[in-house]
């Protein structure tokens, strides 16, 4: 094959699922990460290299980088759960963590966890994509730019906090502009001093190239098959350009860097391609009187299974309900929807809900991150690995999650509530995504911001405010109850309300009403029910279900 056909691109998941949407700690800079790289390599026998155990990362993070232990665990757990654990390993960890009899035993179990050292350092470095630079407004981008500006402004957040984690162009520019630093971070420390003067003599090991595969992949057959980065770099036709020296099993630093930059393109499976050339789905109705048309696009029919994506925008004044192979393991973005009910009842890879208002969104299990940002008066119901919130107002979240809900900045009026639905395939979908009913940390938020956890930011839903929620669709499957059940206080509240209903029914039954009186009572009840439907805006949901 002609080596000119090799294309490399930046993976979506490390940025979409791994880059926490807040400026990174000050000591995640290159200076301190280089020190960390030297430290871990010189302490390989102590659990630092080639795999970094939790105890040593905690020591480095708290003692050297001066971040809190719970923040150190957040980064470690995010990398481990999203990028290293299989579905079976996730279910096994859930069982182990939930059966620990004490906090001491839990810490003992955690001490046995480890991550790939080089990939984890790269994971820490890419947190810089959300770094706020005071110089950037002054210096601007390189001109003329080697790549155009991203055309997805209609779908990306164009606010004070720009949503770079979805933007393929931001991913491309970050890796292209920081490639030298990344290679320096991953290489042997004793090679670092030679970079400026003897870069042509420096060799990069195969394990470094393997680590680069955390953020880079590619193809040689026009995207029909996706190849690991190392496999492409050692492919015989490109060895001269990639700098691979087969007898040494190493790469020339200078040639490898030049080859990557030459072959690097915008991700052909990213959101840009999905919007521009993906399949347009007719899932949503077009509502008269609205300025913008509802849009649903996917790349499912054109990409490998592991790169699926669905983008939904401008859904308004309707109910959209789907359980589809198109959604299975897809990264889903729901953008600028309003006054609607959305049911996506399939196992999902990740979900982002952005700039929506007055919506109820019911999701199948989300294998990784469910992220909500810049939404108003939205209700989300889901099982997920992690829930994260940024700049939300008056939103309610009924979630089952093994990790603490992550609060970034700008949230107000958040209500956390227990997960309270079931549908026939729910437990099968949970098993598919590696999510269990325990542990469940839905009511223990973690504030990864400078804001305090006072009452105007969040509260728990009061048991007397709690009502069950029925998914109004029939599916084949075995789930008939809420997985894990309800917390005792909420279960008691439901039982008390049901008891009052039974008592009222008995009262009516024993009242000895005539047939005419029963008709009158029924008419009054129906009238009051219709008034309630209109007042709560549930009438719209019923009407849209019928249509």
Swiss-Prot record:
Q: Which PROSITE patterns match?
A: C_CAP_COFACTOR_C
Its annotated compartments are: Cytoplasm, Cytoskeleton, Microtubule organizing center, Centrosome; Cytoplasm, Cytoskeleton, Spindle pole
Which Pfam families did the record assign?
Answer: TBCC
Role played: May play a role in the regulation of centrosome and Golgi apparatus positioning.
The UniProt entry's GO CC annotations, sorted and at most eight, read: centrosome; cytoplasm; spindle pole
In the UniProt record, what gene is named as encoding this protein?
Answer: tbccd1
- The main location is cytoplasm
C-CAP/cofactor C-like domain: from which residue to which, for each copy? Answer: 304-435
The organism of origin for this protein: Xenopus tropicalis
* SUPFAM superfamilies xrefs: C-terminal domain of adenylylcyclase associated protein (SSF69340)
Q: Which UniProt keywords apply?
A: Cytoplasm, Cytoskeleton
Under the heading InterPro entries, the entry gives: C-CAP_CF_C-like, CAP/MinC_C, CAP_C_sf, CARP_motif, TBCC1, Tubulin-bd_cofactor_C_dom
- Mind telling me what this protein is named? TBCC domain-containing protein 1
The cross-references to SMART domains, in alphabetical order and at most eight, read:
CARP
Q: Which PANTHER family match?
A: TBCC DOMAIN-CONTAINING PROTEIN 1
* Superkingdom classification of source: Eukaryota
Query: Could you say which protein family the record assigns here?
Result: Belongs to the TBCC family.
């Amino acid at each position: 094959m002609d080596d000119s056909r090799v294309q490399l691109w930046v993976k979506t998941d490390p940025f979409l699922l791994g880059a926490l949407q807040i400026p990174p700690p000050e000591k995640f800079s290159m200076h301190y990460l280089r020190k960390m790289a030297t430290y871990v390599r010189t302490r390989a026998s102590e659990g630092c290299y080639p795999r970094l155990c939790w105890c040593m990362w905690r020591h480095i993070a708290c003692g050297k980088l001066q971040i809190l232990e719970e923040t150190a665990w957040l980064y470690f757990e995010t990398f481990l759960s999203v990028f290293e654990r299989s579905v079976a390993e996730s279910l096994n960890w859930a069982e182990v963590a939930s059966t620990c009899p004490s906090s001491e035993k839990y810490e003992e179990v955690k001490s046995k966890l480890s991550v790939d050292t080089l990939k984890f350092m790269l994971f820490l470095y890419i947190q810089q994509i959300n770094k706020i630079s005071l110089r950037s407004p002054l210096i601007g981008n390189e001109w003329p730019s080697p790549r155009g500006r991203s055309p997805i402004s209609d779908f990306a957040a164009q606010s004070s906090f720009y949503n770079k984690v979805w933007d393929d162009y931001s991913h491309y520019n970050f890796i292209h502009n920081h490639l030298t630093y990344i290679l320096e971070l991953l290489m042997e420390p004793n090679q670092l001093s030679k970079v400026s003067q003897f870069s042509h003599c420096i060799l990069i090991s195969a394990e470094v190239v393997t680590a680069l595969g955390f953020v880079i992949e590619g193809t040689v057959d026009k995207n029909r098959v996706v190849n690991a980065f190392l496999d492409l770099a050692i492919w015989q036709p490109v060895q001269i350009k990639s700098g691979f020296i087969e007898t040494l099993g190493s790469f020339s630093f200078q040639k490898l860097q030049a080859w990557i930059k030459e072959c690097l393109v915008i991700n052909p499976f990213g959101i840009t391609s999905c919007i521009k050339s993906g399949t347009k789905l007719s899932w949503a109705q077009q509502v008269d009187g609205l300025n913008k048309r509802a849009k649903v696009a996917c790349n499912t029919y054109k990409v490998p299974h592991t790169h699926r994506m669905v983008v939904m925008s401008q859904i308004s004044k309707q109910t959209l309900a789907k359980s589809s192979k198109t959604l299975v393991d897809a990264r889903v973005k729901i953008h600028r929807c309003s006054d609607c009910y959305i049911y996506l009842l399939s196992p999902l890879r990740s979900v982002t809900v952005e700039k929506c208002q007055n919506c109820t969104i019911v999701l199948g299990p989300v294998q990784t991150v469910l992220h909500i940002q810049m939404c108003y008066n939205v209700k989300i119901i889901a099982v997920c690995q992690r829930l994260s919130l940024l700049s939300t107002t008056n939103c309610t979240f009924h979630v089952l999650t093994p990790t603490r809900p992550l609060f970034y900045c700008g949230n107000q009026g958040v209500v956390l509530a227990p997960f309270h639905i079931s549908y026939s395939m729910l437990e099968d979908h949970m098993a598919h995504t590696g999510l269990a009913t325990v542990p469940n940390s839905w009511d223990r938020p973690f504030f990864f911001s400078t804001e305090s956890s006072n009452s105007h930011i969040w509260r728990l839903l009061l048991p007397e405010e709690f009502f069950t929620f029925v998914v109004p669709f029939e599916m084949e499957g075995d789930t008939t109850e809420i997985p894990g059940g309800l917390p005792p206080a909420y279960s008691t509240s439901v039982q008390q309300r049901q008891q009052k209903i039974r008592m009222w029914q008995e009262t009516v039954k024993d009242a000895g009403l005539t047939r005419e009186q029963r008709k009158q009572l029924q008419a009054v009840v129906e009238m009051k029910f219709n008034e309630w439907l209109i007042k709560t805006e549930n009438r719209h949901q019923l009407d849209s279900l019928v249509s």
